[in-house]
A protein has these predicted regions:
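Multi-pass alpha-helical transmembrane bundle typical of ion/small-solute transporters
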Residues: 25, 70, 164-224, 240-244, ...
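Transmembrane alpha-helical segments of multi-pass membrane transport proteins and ion-pumping complexes
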Residues: 12-20, 35, 39, 43, ...
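Small-residue-rich segments of transmembrane alpha-helices in multi-pass membrane proteins
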Residues: 32-44, 86-100, 148-164, 217-235, ...
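Structural signature of hydrophobic alpha-helical transmembrane segments
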Residues: 1-11, 51-66, 110-125, 186-197, ...
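Transmembrane helix-loop junctions at the membrane interface of multipass transporters and ion channels
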Residues: 160-180, 236-241, 298-308, 360-373
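Juxtamembrane helix-boundary/capping and inter-helix hinge elements in multi-pass membrane proteins
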Residues: 28, 70-82, 106-111, 131-144, ...
Length: 406
């Protein structure tokens, strides 16, 4: 049935066109329309699930994160990390609490409550950063705070998965609650190895840029993009090897690559501007949108079960939304020293739920049947609503942000 893959890709790219058009006509962000169009394509069975499509979506998000990292100022990022710990920690704990007690409120088991809480922790930074970019806010202090906090949040979420899933799988409701300290120690070791390696590469390897410039200047710079791809996928592979999403590695690849490495000269066939344009088009026009449209296709509406999940979904959505904005925004203000306007933007920017949410849902429902079909829809719909609220709320807040003083 290979023809379905090609047909699905055609519908996806048609969806990208429609999304871009609607975003322009309605003066809204295209990420919102990617998800909506994806939901339409999925419910009308115009895009079928495929490992090949998922792989293309993964490539898209990797390129998006690299492009965003490349546009980031490394020094600003390091300064931002110093402010990020409170935002990430507090901004992860409170959504977990909201998810946990929402499940308890509706009479679900402790296992379910842990799954609900864990699903609500990891932040979908790529969704937020694409939204900020479309509004020309991606180089603000708040954007740096969101990105750095989300990286730390991703680490905390991985640790949460390492701790809680073994507890749940070992029979949490029977009272046999045990923490696998071996797995937890391994996770901490991987975190340390990843960041130490990134630091060493950025501090001692890449500054000796002669080799990179020779690579990028081959054939008058025609292979510069290919050279970038090599570096991006090496970083992505290393991150994946240690249990991170490859997009995290790609972001750091972009962060560590400096523009001077691509100063190929105006007389060359390719210069830094043309290379940046190619990367931008691949990331934000071709492959990146594939990821977000596929994200939308995961929302399959079933009329029979919709009535049962409306109230729990609304309660979970509102509780996470309120807890996330207040906790992340408050932490940004009081632990990170951000201004009021940046703190609010950070609170809004931390709302989206990341791929880890769908991974947890998949493990809990598809692989281990730890949650019911009703819970599956509640978590998927809530994740969708949170993701779709990010561009809407940031778009609505942008005029106030631009008017407010630092």
């Amino acid at each position: 049935m290979e023809h379905y893959i090609w047909l699905s890709m055609a519908f996806i790219f048609i969806g990208v066109y429609i999304s871009k058009f609607l975003a322009h006509k309605t003066n809204t962000v295209d990420v919102l329309w990617f998800i909506i169009i994806g939901a339409v394509l999925g419910n009308f069975h115009l895009v079928k699930e495929s490992h090949a499509l998922e792989f293309l979506g993964d490539i898209g998000i990797i390129l998006v994160m690299f492009a965003l990292g490349f546009e980031e100022d490394a020094k600003a990022f390091v300064d931002g990390v110093k402010k990020a710990w409170g935002i990430a920690l507090i901004g992860a704990i409170f959504p977990f609490i909201a998810g946990y007690y929402s499940a308890i409120l509706f009479g679900f088991s402790q296992n379910s409550a842990l799954i609900w809480g864990l699903t609500m922790t990891a932040t979908a930074v790529s969704l937020t950063m694409m939204t900020l970019k479309s509004l020309n806010l991606h180089k603000t202090k708040a954007a740096t705070g969101i990105m750095t906090s989300a990286v730390v949040d991703d680490v905390l979420s991985l640790i949460g998965v390492a701790i809680l899933l073994p507890i749940i799988l070992s029979g949490g409701d029977t009272g046999n609650l045990t923490i696998n300290y071996t797995e937890l120690s391994i996770t901490f070791a991987k975190v340390i190895i990843f960041f130490v390696t990134v630091y060493l590469v950025g501090r001692f390897v890449l500054p000796h840029d002669n080799g990179l410039q020779k690579l990028f200047k081959l054939e008058n710079g025609q292979y510069a993009v290919l050279g970038i791809f090599v570096i991006v996928f090496l970083f992505g592979a290393f991150a994946h090897l240690l249990g991170f999403h490859p997009a995290i590695g790609a972001y750091f690849a972009g962060l560590l690559l400096k523009e001077e490495y691509l100063q190929l000269g105006q007389d060359k066939f390719y210069n830094i501007k043309s290379v940046e344009d190619i990367i931008h088009n691949l990331a934000f026009v071709i492959f990146g949108p594939v990821f977000f449209i596929l994200l939308g296709t995961k929302i399959i509406f079933d009329v029979n079960i919709l009535g049962e999940v409306i109230l729990p979904t609304i309660v979970l959505f509102l509780s996470v939304l309120i807890f996330q904005i207040i906790s992340a925004g408050g932490a940004a203000k009081f632990t990170g020293g951000y201004s009021n306007k940046d703190s609010i933007l950070i609170g809004l920017g931390m709302l989206g739920r990341a791929e880890l949410a769908f991974i947890v849902i998949n493990i809990a429902y598809v692989q281990n049947q730890l949650i019911t079909q009703q819970e599956f829809y509640i978590l998927v719909f809530t994740t969708f609503l949170l993701n779709i609220s990010v561009p809407l709320l940031i778009k609505a807040y942008t005029p106030f942000y631009n008017k407010m003083k630092d």
